[in-house]
A protein has these predicted regions:
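Conserved structural position at the C-terminal beta-strand
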Residues: 112-114
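Bacterial Sec-dependent N-terminal signal peptides
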Residues: 2-3, 13-48, 116-151, 351, ...
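Short strand-edge motifs at loop-to-beta-strand transitions and within beta-strands
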Residues: 91-97
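Short beta-strand segments within Ig-like beta-sandwich modules, predominantly Fibronectin type-III
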Residues: 83-91
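Acidic, Ser/Thr
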Residues: 55-63
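Surface-exposed, short loops/turns at beta-strand junctions within beta-sandwich domains
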Residues: 98-105
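Conserved positions within compact, well-structured domain cores
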Residues: 132-356
Length: 356
């Protein structure tokens, strides 16, 4: 009998012994349980410094007696906090917690209890995020304070963006995060969507727009870049990286330049673009692409988000039939590709300063 088999046999024997002891103990002491299942939800993402309200429900006392509730948020709380108000099984019980100033992941644990009964518990995780760009926010790794960047403030909502000049045009170096509905002058085109429908993520990953929304979302004096603007950007990137731009075309593949547009950034200290040896991330254009993926939107269904750690996808103003041209970067390939997407696709938007 080899060592692995000995270990497996020992583990099995211990499990059988433990089960035997447990059965004998269960015969001696019966544990009483509360009725129902504890339900509470924590938002997936929250802004640092914000106040979050939680509501727990779903549990009742078998004898309709009062229930108590205590909770703990970690990191942040050294010990649990018991609520003074008795738990209401019909309407639930709500409490608030103020999120700290540091972007991080929290665990929220909730317990409902009654004398003589085993407590019912549930836990959720949530991630706090910050749009600060001074090195203490959620996105770090890009030095926007270098002399290569300028800034622009959108008068519509007061949000500011870093900009960079590349390919003879001034580009947003961050994804547009305008959250209000846009119009083509005659029709309301609706709003874009933030990542996983979390408002807290709007200023982190930007807003995901359909192509028609993207055509009208940029502030006055800025526009959705067309294929020619992207081509000029790609040619400059090729020069920066010392690769040939021969064969580059508006709707073609930009060979060997993806790293010139990618930034080696982290989200809450976790690297966004996984390392692949064939992709040399230099961000030599200052474009600062993040791996935010794309979304599929359709009618009243909840948008589905994909490839947030694998791709960066950007609309252009060019169309073909009822589709729009987009360019995309993948984590494991040095080339920038192009494709055509229908109106059910939502992607990131980089505004470029209007030529006129």
């Amino acid at each position: 009998m080899n060592f692995k088999k000995i270990l497996r046999t020992a583990v099995f024997a211990a499990a059988v012994a433990l089960a035997t002891v447990s059965c004998k103990k269960d015969e001696e002491t019966a544990v009483a349980y509360l009725s129902g299942s504890l339900v509470f939800k924590a938002p997936g993402y929250v802004k640092t410094g914000s106040e979050v309200t939680f509501t727990a429900s779903g549990v009742t006392h078998p004898e309709n007696k009062p229930l108590g509730l205590y909770y703990k948020v970690t990191p942040g709380m050294e010990k649990s906090d018991t609520l003074d108000v008795p738990f209401d099984p019909e309407n639930g019980l709500s409490w608030t917690y103020t999120i700290g100033d540091e972007p991080q992941t929290y665990t929220v644990a909730c317990y409902v209890f009654a004398t003589g009964y085993s407590a019912s518990s549930s836990s959720q995780t949530m991630v706090s995020v910050s749009s600060r760009t001074d090195g203490t926010g959620s996105i770090t790794g890009t030095d926007f304070n270098s002399g290569a960047y300028s800034s622009f403030t959108d008068e519509r909502d007061g949000k500011s963006y870093f900009t960079v000049t590349a390919g003879g045009r001034e580009w947003f170096a961050q994804n547009l995060a305008y959250e209000e509905a846009v119009s083509d002058g005659e029709n309301d085109l609706g709003c874009g969507v933030p990542y996983v429908n979390s408002e807290a993520m709007a200023d982190i990953f930007g807003i995901y727009y359909t192509q028609e929304q993207a055509r009208h979302a940029c502030p006055d004096g800025w526009e959705l870049p067309d294929g020619e603007a992207w081509l000029a950007l790609a040619v400059e990137a090729a020069g920066n990286e010392g690769v040939s731009s021969d064969g580059f075309a508006v709707a073609g593949t930009f060979t060997g330049i993806a790293g010139a547009l990618m930034t080696d950034a982290a989200f809450n200290t976790i690297t966004m673009w996984e390392y692949w040896p064939q992709v040399k991330i230099t961000n030599s254009t200052g474009f600062s692409a993040l791996s935010t993926g794309f979304a599929t939107v359709s009618g009243d269904t909840v948008p589905a988000f994909e490839a947030a750690t694998q791709k960066a996808v950007f609309w252009t103003a060019d169309t073909e039939g009822d589709t729009g041209l987009y360019h995309y970067i993948t984590v494991d390939n040095p080339d920038i590709y192009s494709g055509y997407g229908y109106e059910s696709m939502a992607a990131s938007l980089r505004c470029v300063k209007s030529a006129n």
